[in-house]
Amino acid sequence: MLDLRLLRENPEATQARLDRRHSSYDIQPLLSLDQQVRQWEQERTQLQARSNEIGRSVGQKMREGADPQSEEIAALREEGNQLKQQIADLEQQERQVRSELDTYLLTLPNLPDETVPLGSSEDENREIHRWGDDRIREGEFAPHWEIGERLGLFDFERSTRIAQSRFVTLLGAGAALERALIAFMLDRQTAAGYTEVAPPYLINSASLTASGQLPKFSEESFRCDRDDLWLTPTAEVPLTSLYRDEILSADQLPLRYCAYTPCFRREAGSYGRDTRGLIRLHQFNKVELYQFVHPDHSEAAHQQLLANAEAILQALELPYRTIELCTGDLGFSAQKTYDIEVWLPSAGRYREISSCSNCGDFQARRANIRFKEAGQKGTRFVHTLNGSGLAVGRTMAAVLENYQQPDGSVRVPEALQPYLRQTVIGQP
């Protein structure tokens, strides 16, 4: 959530930064609502002051022996009653407009960091670096879904019977490979200083609002209407709310967490895209990285989180590239984002496998997560950062494609062999 005071005091500069996203966000309706609320607050304060003055005057006159039935006392009491009604009416109007103001504020995205490259689409994202170019092989490569079905690792047809399209059932070595990847990722991140968390998979609307999924992305998530619970679209959501409505001490920061969860998404806007394989499913597994940090250390934490995600691909010896998203491609809650894209040889291109974002104080304002410096007055909002470390299904797809052998088998990456207890999956 944006700082209302910033919007109020620097409307032109704030609008200009929003416009860098190349989206039609307009802060003027919000400023009009804010002005109306503040005007009513001022009127209510004046009416309350007059009401208090009347109360004191009546009390004083009664102590001086005035007749309670006198016209003067009756007139003062009548004015006091009218003022109370006016105040009540103003409070009701103010509550309604303040609710509209808060709702509008929740629809505005984060402001891009000044260092983010200007651009309107993913075509203007900037490549930062590549790793593993020497491991990219030439030739014809089978796509991962053909490899998996041939080796009996997963079954899409029966999954459609069980659920619907865009679901998968993992079998045998396929299920074992996914379990190995999850354990490997969690072990690597806990060794890097993250605390493992196993959060609820069902989350309430307040948690989705705090992280920025609601109200904008309500159509992207699966909801249990009877209980106001949603299937989590990412562990970022419950991790954001770990400290919702809490005040931390500065010496607690940074707080770094990793969590494995299944993730559930409707993928409503992706009709016809990636209809085969593990790239775009309604249910998929992911290991998420999350940090609560001091604002002064936010950028350094972002670089650290990115390195932690990249380290998984390096350990698996999977070629990848890292790009910085331009302003027009930023996610709703992010002020700066790096995407990591892994090489898929069957397609001859890189595909996103992780998105590492610095959200500044945007999510912390929505979740009301603050911290206090020792010996200082007041509190400040923490900064939050999140990233995939990594998307498990896409990592499996990359392993199957990059490690496929001429005889039809798949060599197990050396880093996974202690987890999978085999060096090769499948035989010709």
UniProtKB/Swiss-Prot annotation:
Residues reported to bind ATP: R265, R266, E267, E352, I353, S354, S355
Gene Ontology molecular function: ATP binding; serine-tRNA ligase activity
Superkingdom per UniProt: Bacteria
EC class of the enzyme, as a word: ligase
Coiled-coil segments on the chain, per record: none
Entry text on domains: Consists of two distinct domains, a catalytic core and a N-terminal extension that is involved in tRNA binding.
Protein name in the entry: Serine--tRNA ligase
Organism (species): Synechococcus elongatus (strain ATCC 33912 / PCC 7942 / FACHB-805) (Anacystis nidulans R2)
Gene for this chain: serS
